[in-house]
C-alpha cells in the first residue's frame, strides 16, 4: 500500500506556523509522509528545523501581496507566478493526497498549484476577518476552517473555534530552578505582569517598560521581548528574548498578561482562563484584524483592551486594577467558553474531511 502524503504550507510569522507544528507530529505518528512548502529564509523554515520533525522542506519564491499600488507589485506578481510553477513541480513529484495551509503570503502559490492538480486544499483562518492571502486561498479551497464564525455566504467555511495545545489545568512551577531564581528578585507583595508581544508587536512593549520606571515600583514585570540585548534579571524585572520550556511556568507566575491581539495568543489565554489586557496593533501596523479580535474578546467578557495610544502607566494601572477587582467575573466567562478545540479533536476532524474529499485519489 502506497504511503499517504501530505504537504503543509504557511509562514511569514510564527502564527502562520504554530498550528502546522501541532498537526505534523500527529500525521507522522499515523504513518504519513510529511512535506512542507515555504520560504527557506522565513520563520517557517527556522521552526521546522528547530522542531527536528521528519519533514521534507521545499523552498519556493514568494512575493508580498499588497492592497495598495506599488511598483514592487509588478515584480511580486512574477515571484508568485514562479512560486506556483515551483509548487506544481513539487506536487507532481510528491503526489500528495492533500494540502493543508495556515496562510501567509508564501501559502498562495501552493494553494493555487494544488487546486490546478485537483488536490484537496484545506485552509485555516485564525482571525475574525480573512487576510489577503487567505481571501485568495478561499477561492481555491476545498474547506476553510475558521476560529470565528463567518457569514453564511462563505459556504466553504467550517467554524471549529480556536485550536490550542494549552492544558487548562494549572501546572506547578515550584520546582523550577529558574523560576525560583526569578522569584528571589520579585517582591511577593506585588502582583506580577507578563508582557508578550509576538513576533511583530513586542517593540512598543519593550520601549514602554524601559521608559516607565514606576512600573516596577508597583508590579513585578516579566517581558518576553524578542530582543536578546534586553535580557536582564533585576529588582522586580525579568526580561528575556525567547522562551520555550519556560513559557508555561512564566505564564503561571503572572497575575495579569498584557498581550497584542493575535488570535493564537489570546485564545491560549482564554484556554488558560488567564486575566489579560489586549493592546492591539492598529491599522497603521496591520490590516486591523487585531482590533477586531480585541473588540470581540472585550464584548464576550474575556478581556479588556487598551489602545496603543493610551498605553501609559496611569491607564494601564487602572485597567489592571479593574481586572483584578472583577477577576471572578472574567474567569467565569473564560472557563464557560465553548470556543476551544484541542489539537487531537481538530486532527480527527481534519482526517475525516480528508478521507471524505480524497476518495479515489
UniProtKB/Swiss-Prot annotation:
Subcellular location: Cell membrane
UniProt topology in membrane: Peripheral membrane protein
Cellular component aspect of the GO annotation: plasma membrane
E.C. designation(s): 2.4.1.227
GO biological process, one term: lipid glycosylation
InterPro entries from the UniProt entry: GlcNAc_MurG, Glyco_trans_28_C, GlycoTrans_28_N
Binding site for UDP-N-acetyl-alpha-D-glucosamine: 199, 290
Family statement drawn from the similarity comment of this UniProt entry: Belongs to the glycosyltransferase 28 family. MurG subfamily.
Name of the molecule in the record: UDP-N-acetylglucosamine--N-acetylmuramyl-(pentapeptide) pyrophosphoryl-undecaprenol N-acetylglucosamine transferase
Organism: Streptococcus mutans serotype c (strain ATCC 700610 / UA159)
